[in-house]
Amino acid sequence: MFTDIDTQMNTSHALGSATTIRSKSLNLDKAIAQAQAQLHALQHPDGYWLFELEADCTIPAEYIMMMHYIGEIDPILQSKIAVYLRAKQSADGSYPLFHGGAGDLSCSVKVYYALKLAGDDIHAPHMSRLRHYILSQGGAAKANVFTRIALAIFEQLPWRGVPYIPVEIMLFPKWFPFHLDKVSYWSRTVMVPLFILCTLEAKAKNPQQISILELFVLHPDKEKHYFPERTLLNKFFLILDKIGRVTRPLIPKKMHQLAIKKAEQWIVERLNGEDGLGGIFPAMVNAYEALLLLGYDKNHSYVKTAKQAIDKLLVVKDHEAYCQPCLSPVWDTGLTALALQEVDKIGNREVLTRAYRWLKSKQLTNEPGDWQLTRPELAGGGWAFQFANPHYPDVDDTAVVAFAMAESNLPDLTDSIQLASQWIVGMQSKNGGYGAFDVDNTYYYLNEIPFADHGALLDPPTVDVSARCAMLMAKMAKQHPDYLPALHRTIDYIRSEQEDNGSW
């Protein structure tokens, strides 16, 4: 039996707990209100949101290397990027691919070269630590393909140290084991200008003739193991690589010129104005350098526009600067709108109306796109990640934006939601899942080619993208029961991909 004192203590404890809960609730409400007000203030007058998209240090380093490739160096900008790069170094001297991650050899090599190009003394403590890390990982010869191509262009290693990727690949028929349509969109946009740069063996101007031979364990001319044999299939592709190099002189000149012209036309068709080839930095910078190598004057509209697209990615602050991998207004706007309407659909109506009006204007309904190669009869309806990237709408952005629209209960969005939902259902892969940009991009044997050591050649279905598509289809299935078969296939795919510990 409780005594009066026990009762008083229990009552006091309960009141204290309730007070704590109310206090936390008030703090949470205050935080939500402050975040909401800040998001209101950050909305562009046109209706979108755009936040900085910071990645690893590879791209800022590549921006410095690009300046030295063309021989046009902005010393103030270079100095600010160097400040940014130094600040991101890990304690062991390396540079990771994500905050707090393990060091990455390829990223570290590019940062070292960029800092040396920017004038850093190789005996400075940060450079010594970085060099020690690189050498401990086998040196620059063990960096990935993209890094070795950059080093070959800067004449730091021989061209035999990079895969044989002739521009004649542009002429391969679709049934051929390797074809552009069989790799991801980002691989396509990066590779086509690389075909030109590698086939013509581009040479950086490198006005100060900066070398990084100190990053090689063995002199690059003596190195014989640029391509470690990973599997039996990989060994077979390495043999084909050697055969291709030997037979290269046998390629007819007309065929060679035709292939270069086709690659050039492919790039020009997709230059995408000031939003750039593919809307991503690696493709943009390769296209910019390829156009110059093909003889385009630096004042040609294609070249000037390509450079402007690259420079739009810069984030320049008072004391530092970096280059983003791409811009993300559609993604940022979709997620922000979804968050705001979860807080208050009525109070945020004006803000949301502006956001969805802008998003409607960015929906891709009739534009030609690479996705149509596998779905020629499917009507458009997707969104791209960037301000403009009409050849490459993506399933992920489309699912998020359409879901947010459907949740908003705002008028005049029905047609956009319907087009997007139909497009999503039509972009389903055979296994029920969804890739980011393409259908059934599952030519896994291509991961064994020498060029694919970076592990991002393909665009196969993934659980996270598929889950967002399932959210949209589930939302729409009440009005469109014809979506249910696709939804069930997606759920089956997601379940099949669950990890042993229960996670995805």
Residue ranges and their predicted role:
Residues 1-504:
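Preference for long, amphipathic alpha-helical scaffolds in soluble/luminal domains
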